[in-house]
Each structure stands twice: as structure tokens, then as C-alpha cells.
């Protein structure tokens, strides 16, 4: 494996699994040349180079939900495919792996037109529109959750789990003997979540009186408002727009109050962190609700619909959070259930599957089967 092109972007939920695979490729093939192709306007343009990986941006934007701007986005996507064709021809990758999102679309189509081996990885239990389309042209489809609905052709689909970075897995090892200390991690994904921010701000007096320590990722839009609310409530906490070191955050906390994007779900599982999920209700095909249900049904988490969160008296939500934080036995049981859902071998499985694709080997199981799958 000499040259690998990875492509995705738009949100951390797509970007970080791709970075985990890049990390594994570097571990197995230190001399491999990795090129990451994403959107010029997405967070990948900042995040990927910061991880020491060469990045090429295509001037593409999402087409779905853009209304009158959709024709312009479609024109940009077409131009992105043309530019992607030149880029793929120049780089000449052994294999191309896409991780979903509109930013992967142009590069994947370009790679297929160049007749390069192509694979896609789907992070969520319900696939997004980009991967539903790209799976039709891909040679392999790697999935994070079992696929009882058969969204993808079974003859080219293999379960791998969702890859997490080595530092996140190491946080899980660090937490093996973790003694709960009434610590809460609040995060709404890489861009924050206004509904979560508001809910936590409204219950700050109860959390303060219960002695709860808080690390709160607000997203950029709400940072100053939330910081001001903590100051007014007299709550000492770490309030940031973005947590740079998620591994340290997972190692520190006892419980997460968060969205249920697939990357968050699998990182929590790898780290063994129990969660109260508030799925983003407007996610494509409501995939976050399905992700949360998968963990809640197995005793690793609780799930609250956003409409219920918004109508719930602050004291009720605070009571639910505080009761969990004070119940060490229950937290430890949820943590153990989280660990059972982890897929620490996911990145290696995807690299192995990509290697099979290059060598034109038939589809095979890449991870051990588990009870209930």
C-alpha cells in the first residue's frame, strides 16, 4: 500500500474516522503517501493539516437543502469532479476510501471515472444520502452498525465498526480503574448544540449545589453567552468552544451529556464513558435517534428526545443527571456496557479491507461477530 486517497469533510463525525484510518495506515505502512481530499470551505481544511496530513480542497458545497442555491452548488460539484479527475490522475492512488458527506462525493466519482479501487465507510446506523449514492459505485462498503435493513448490497458490504483514534482508545485503558468523581462532560458535536447549551444553563443552580464538576463544549456561536451564564450562577467550570484533546476529556469525565453522532457514540464506547444522549432531531434520516437507541437498548446509555428536553423542567433533568452521577454502581455498569460496544479493531479492519481490494481478494469478515449482531 503505497498511495492512499482519503476523502470526506463537513463535520468532525466524518473527518475523525478518516483520521483514525490515516493513523493506522501510517502505523502499518510508515512510507505510505496519504492524500486527504475534502471541501475547501469545511473544517477539514483546518483539522487535517494540523494532523500532519497533506490536504487538497475542492470548491464543493452540499446540494441537499440549499433551495434556490442548489443549482450553484450542483455546478460547483460538477467543477469539483473535473478538478478531482486531474487530482486523482496526478496522485495515482492504489485505493480511494470515502467517509461520507458531500465533500467526498466529487473525489469518489472522479476516482471511479479513473477506474481506481473505491471503498466507502458509513459511520451511522442509517446511511446519509452521499453514501447511499456512492455505495452504488463503490467496490466495498464498510459499515459501523449491523445492517438489518440492508441499505447496501450485502455482497460488497462488511461490518468493521467506526474507527477511533489511538489516543481515544488509550483513554479507555486509562479509565479501566476509574473511580467516579461527579464529573459531567457536555458536548454537542464539533459545532456545539444550542438546545443542550440552554438546558445545561437552566439547571446550573442544581448542578452547582450537587457539587458537579463540568467541562462544557459549547460551539463557537454560544461560547460567550454560556460562559456568562456560568459566571452569573457562580459555577466554576471549563467552558470552551471546542475541546482539542477529547482523549483527556473522556479520561476525566464520569458521564457525557451529548448528541448521538456515530463518531461520538463509538468514541464514548472505546473510552467506556456512559452517556445521556439527546439526538439531533434534524439529522439526515434521523440517524442519531437510531444510534442512541442502539446503545440505550444495551444498557450503555439513556436517550432523551430533544422535544422532551425542551419541555422538561430544569430540576427534573438536573435530578436525572445528578442521580446518575451519584449512583456509582450504575455508572460502572453502563461503562462496562459501553466497552462491550467498542470496536477497537475498526481502523485496522478498514485498512485490511482496503488491502484486500487492492489485491482483488474476495469479501471476508474483518471483525469478530458479537452477540446480537
From Swiss-Prot:
Pathway: Cell wall biogenesis; peptidoglycan biosynthesis. One of its GO terms (biological process) is cell division. Keywords: Cell cycle, Cell division, Cell inner membrane, Cell membrane, Cell shape, Cell wall biogenesis/degradation, Glycosyltransferase, Membrane, Peptidoglycan synthesis, Transferase. Pfam families: Glyco_tran_28_C, Glyco_transf_28. It catalyses: di-trans,octa-cis-undecaprenyl diphospho-N-acetyl-alpha-D-muramoyl-L-alanyl-D-glutamyl-meso-2,6-diaminopimeloyl-D-alanyl-D-alanine + UDP-N-acetyl-alpha-D-glucosamine = di-trans,octa-cis-undecaprenyl diphospho-[N-acetyl-alpha-D-glucosaminyl-(1->4)]-N-acetyl-alpha-D-muramoyl-L-alanyl-D-glutamyl-meso-2,6-diaminopimeloyl-D-alanyl-D-alanine + UDP + H(+). Its EC number is 2.4.1.227. This is UDP-N-acetylglucosamine--N-acetylmuramyl-(pentapeptide) pyrophosphoryl-undecaprenol N-acetylglucosamine transferase. It is found in: Cell inner membrane. Cell wall formation. Catalyzes the transfer of a GlcNAc subunit on undecaprenyl-pyrophosphoryl-MurNAc-pentapeptide (lipid intermediate I) to form undecaprenyl-pyrophosphoryl-MurNAc-(pentapeptide)GlcNAc (lipid intermediate II). Belongs to the glycosyltransferase 28 family. MurG subfamily. It is a peripheral membrane protein. SUPFAM superfamilies: UDP-Glycosyltransferase/glycogen phosphorylase (SSF53756). One of its GO terms (cellular component) is plasma membrane. UDP-N-acetyl-alpha-D-glucosamine binds at residues 11-13, 124, 165, 190, 288. It comes from the Bacteria. Gene3D superfamilies: Glycogen Phosphorylase B. One of its GO terms (molecular function) is UDP-N-acetyl-D-glucosamine:N-acetylmuramoyl-L-alanyl-D-glutamyl-meso-2,6-diaminopimelyl-D-alanyl-D-alanine-diphosphoundecaprenol 4-beta-N-acetylglucosaminlytransferase activity.
